[in-house]
């Protein structure tokens, strides 16, 4: 009898230890981080299940298709020198980019030139050793200050103009608030060189890239249009309770259940986002994620009566960001075959999507004309002119106080707790390249 009992215990222990290999790893979010984590896991022979609330993959990489071309609502640019992992994804997808070369302003380039060299030297010798994902090597005090403070301390006079251009229109906030750590991660000497008009970058349809790449790269199920009603981590294994829409967008009456060996949360882990998934947070998770900041960032595709290949930016002193009211800060008609402009707006924590949309229409109505003819009155922009408008929970980051308080060390200690892992722009920076790296690194480090 004793021998029989021991045999049962042995079998149970064997089954328990085998569960992580039998059960799938559940990934919440089918953006660049979640998709590349899934690919890396499948390469290791692990099963995956992906949950995505949108009806298509790509995360923030969405687009509107009209006039026989794409109009990006998310990421649109990449650089061969600074985006090595992105290049691999693009190659697999079979898509190609179009070079966007800026108009070179020789006077400004000369002004920036000597400061650029100092910046590149600092980036290589001081910042690069601390640039690892999840900032595992620590964050020196000098990298926790705001971007404005860092620029002033290093006596940069021309670079603030480039930083404003690189930050505001692309959703990265106010240099007077955002720590320099993140801007150095973003603005490699190569990327800063683009904003200094030294060279061009590549423009590509990232939504198509991810759709095509996913078809070729991932074999596990992807539950698009799914609503997670609870992520239960109270037991030994995480359980995701969800409702998955059918092909007509109808959700089932009864929720479905997926038991997971682990969960990778591939979205910005803000407290509201975690609470929306009904995650019961631990005290440590509440401490780490409560001060997490986002930039309220909106993107649109609007049909306008402006000349082709024309851009507008909100007026402000060149080294001072425009106010974050929710109004558009920049627009650009990317193709001379279309009169659809891509727009970018940024707001504050009280800016709602309806408010930002109304500000978009009001602002663009004033400039919806040919600016070369001062007698022409702007044509009102109405709902049918707006082909797409997207609100983005953008650029998750910690503030100077948290960075100085060792918040990334606290964040890294959460990885794996309750079989939960985090992969998003918070791990490095909010770009396609760093999202890809975040997904890969989490798998390489913990699986």
Annotate each predicted stretch with a short phrase.
Residues 261-262, 271-421, 429-433, 437:
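C-terminal segments that line or cap access tunnels to active or ligand-binding sites in enzymes
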Residues 87-178:
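Mobile amphipathic helical/loop "lid" adjacent to a hydrophobic cofactor/ligand pocket
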Residues 187-262:
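Helical element adjacent to the flavin cofactor pocket in flavoenzyme catalytic cores
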Residues 63-86:
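N-terminal glycine-rich dinucleotide-binding loop that anchors FAD/FMN and/or NAD(P) in oxidoreductases
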Residues 1-20:
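Fungal secretory targeting signals
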Residues 42-65:
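Glycine-rich FAD pyrophosphate-binding loop
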Residues 22-50:
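N-terminal Rossmann-like FAD-binding beta1-loop-alpha1 element of flavoenzymes
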Residues 435-447:
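Internal hydrophobic alpha-helix adjacent to the cofactor/substrate pocket in enzyme cavities
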């Amino acid at each position: 009898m004793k021998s029989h009992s021991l045999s049962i215990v042995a079998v149970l222990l064997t089954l328990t230890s085998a569960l992580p290999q039998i059960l799938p790893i559940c990934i919440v979010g089918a953006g660049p981080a979640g998709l590349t984590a899934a690919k890396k896991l499948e390469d290791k022979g692990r099963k995956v299940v992906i949950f995505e609330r949108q009806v298509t993959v790509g995360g923030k990489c969405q687009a509107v298709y009209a006039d026989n071309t794409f109009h990006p609502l998310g990421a649109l640019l990449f650089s061969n020198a600074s985006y090595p992992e992105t290049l691999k994804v693009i190659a697999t997808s079979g898509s190609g980019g179009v070079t966007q070369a800026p108009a070179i302003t020789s006077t400004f380039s000369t002004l920036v030139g000597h400061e650029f060299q100092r910046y590149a030297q600092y980036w290589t010798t001081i910042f690069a050793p601390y640039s690892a994902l999840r900032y595992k090597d620590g964050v020196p005090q000098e990298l926790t200050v705001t971007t404005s403070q860092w620029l002033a301390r290093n006596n940069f006079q021309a670079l603030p103009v480039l930083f404003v251009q690189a930050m505001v229109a692309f959703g990265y906030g106010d240099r007077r608030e955002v720590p320099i750590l993140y801007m150095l991660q973003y603005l490699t000497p190569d990327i800063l060189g683009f904003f200094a008009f030294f060279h061009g970058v590549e423009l590509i349809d990232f939504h198509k890239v991810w759709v095509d790449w996913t078809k070729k790269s991932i074999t596990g199920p992807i539950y698009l249009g799914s609503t997670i009603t609870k992520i239960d981590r109270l037991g030994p294994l995480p359980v995701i309770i969800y409702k998955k829409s059918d092909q007509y967008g109808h959700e089932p009456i009864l929720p479905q259940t997926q038991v997971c060996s682990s969960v990778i949360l591939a979205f910005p882990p803000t407290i509201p986002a975690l609470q929306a998934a009904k995650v019961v947070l631990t005290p440590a998770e509440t401490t780490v994620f409560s001060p997490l900041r986002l930039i309220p960032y909106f993107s649109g595709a609007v049909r306008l009566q402006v000349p082709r290949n024309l851009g507008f930016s909100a007026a402000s002193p060149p080294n001072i960001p425009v106010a974050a009211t929710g109004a558009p800060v920049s627009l650009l008609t990317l193709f001379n075959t279309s009169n659809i402009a891509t727009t970018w707006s940024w707001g504050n924590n009280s800016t709602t999507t309806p408010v930002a949309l109304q500000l978009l229409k009001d602002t663009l109505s004033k400039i919806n004309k040919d600016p070369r003819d001062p007698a022409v009155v702007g044509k009102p922009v109405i709902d049918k002119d707006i082909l797409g408008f997207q609100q983005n929970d953008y650029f998750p980051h910690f503030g100077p106080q948290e960075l100085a308080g060792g918040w990334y060390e606290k964040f890294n200690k959460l990885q794996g707790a309750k079989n939960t892992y985090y992969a998003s722009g918070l791990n490095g920076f909010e770009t396609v390249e760093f999202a890809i790296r975040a997904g890969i690194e989490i798998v390489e480090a913990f699986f």
